[in-house]
């Protein structure tokens, strides 16, 4: 709640086949490996103890792309004992290496000139994050996060990543989050969640949640957490869409301020939030500060927080 915009970065998580500690580090080897004019990408693991770069795929998978492997390695034992350089002898000269140094989903806190990476709670690391949206779901004046989770489109030799049901994270205003499980939040989506967006669909002053699924119906959750917030709709030159990029911030009766909220239509994966912003009302909101994309700044007094506040230039 310091007025600086932070970043939220979803990742593969720490519970996939790519998980690693200090013993085996995941790499991606990419280039024209087979010499056939096509660009290839192979997953590899660097074994720290033996200082060897090893293939991650089984031979039955790789030989479909590189038939010569069966001739060079008649048995699986021979293949398992070989390094990646030995398997593709003389064919990795033009290839490049990329190291997967961090698989955790994190929040990047803006410290003014630098970002501090802070991992999200462990429940956010159990499965990949495909989408995220930010709102003050419990109206306590601190921004919260919803994460769309799960990924099923994996190879036969890998396991399906389905440990998530959609995760609500309640923020503390200092960059920390607490996981709220489905039996408490009511959010239980067991499919492949993709896009997610928020909007006040029943005009009760609370941000509701819409979640899309791959090969499944979308899920709508009406919010009953906390008290109602302040509804704000921005218009620039008479258009709500032209207000995109404006920054809103609540000013409370005691002079303190809430978090900065960016009026951005985009949300998560191919999703769009409502143009009406819901500002959490932990304390009585006295006014709303707006920094418009044009550089103009304005302050609007809040007379009745129960009414929709429409602001424009």
Write out the residue ranges for each language-model feature.
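Phosphate-binding active sites in nucleotide-utilizing proteins
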Residues: 143
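Acidic, divalent-cation-chelating loop motifs in proteins
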Residues: 1-2, 30-34, 134-140, 198-204
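C-terminal lobe substrate-recognition/regulatory segment of protein kinase catalytic domains
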Residues: 46-88
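Gly/Ser/Thr/Pro-enriched helix-cap/hinge segments flanking short amphipathic alpha-helices
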Residues: 18-25, 36, 43-45, 70-81, ...
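Catalytic or ion-translocation cores adjacent to nucleophile or general acid/base/metal-coordination motifs
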Residues: 15
């Amino acid at each position: 709640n310091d007025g600086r915009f932070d970043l939220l970065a979803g990742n593969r998580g720490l519970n996939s086949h790519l998980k690693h500690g200090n013993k085996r580090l995941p790499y991606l080897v990419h280039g024209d490996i087979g010499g056939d004019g096509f660009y290839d990408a192979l997953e590899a693991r660097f074994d720290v103890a033996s200082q060897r770069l090893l293939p991650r795929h089984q031979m039955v998978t790789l030989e479909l792309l590189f038939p010569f492997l069966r001739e060079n390695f008649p048995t699986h034992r021979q293949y398992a004992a070989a390094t990646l350089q030995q398997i593709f002898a003389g064919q990795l000269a033009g290839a490049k290496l990329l190291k997967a140094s961090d698989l955790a989903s994190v929040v990047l806190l803006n410290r003014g000139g630098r970002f501090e990476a802070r991992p999200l709670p462990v429940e956010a690391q159990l499965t990949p994050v495909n989408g995220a949206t930010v709102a003050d779901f419990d109206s306590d004046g601190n921004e919260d996060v919803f994460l769309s989770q799960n990924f099923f489109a994996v190879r036969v030799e890998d396991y399906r990543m389905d440990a998530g049901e959609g995760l609500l994270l309640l923020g503390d205003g200092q960059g920390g989050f607490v996981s709220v499980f489905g039996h408490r939040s009511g959010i239980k989506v067991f499919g492949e969640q993709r896009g997610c967006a928020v909007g006040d669909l029943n005009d009760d002053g609370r941000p509701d949640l819409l979640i899309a699924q791959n090969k499944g119906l979308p899920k709508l959750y009406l919010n009953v957490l906390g008290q109602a917030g302040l509804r704000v709709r921005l218009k620039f030159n008479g258009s709500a869409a032209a207000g995109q990029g404006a920054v809103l911030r609540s000013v409370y009766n005691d002079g303190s301020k809430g978090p900065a909220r960016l009026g951005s239509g985009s949300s998560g994966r191919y999703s769009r939030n409502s143009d009406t912003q819901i500002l959490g009302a932990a304390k009585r909101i006295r006014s709303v500060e707006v920094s418009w994309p044009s550089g103009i700044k304005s302050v609007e007094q809040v007379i009745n927080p129960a009414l929709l506040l429409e602001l424009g230039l």
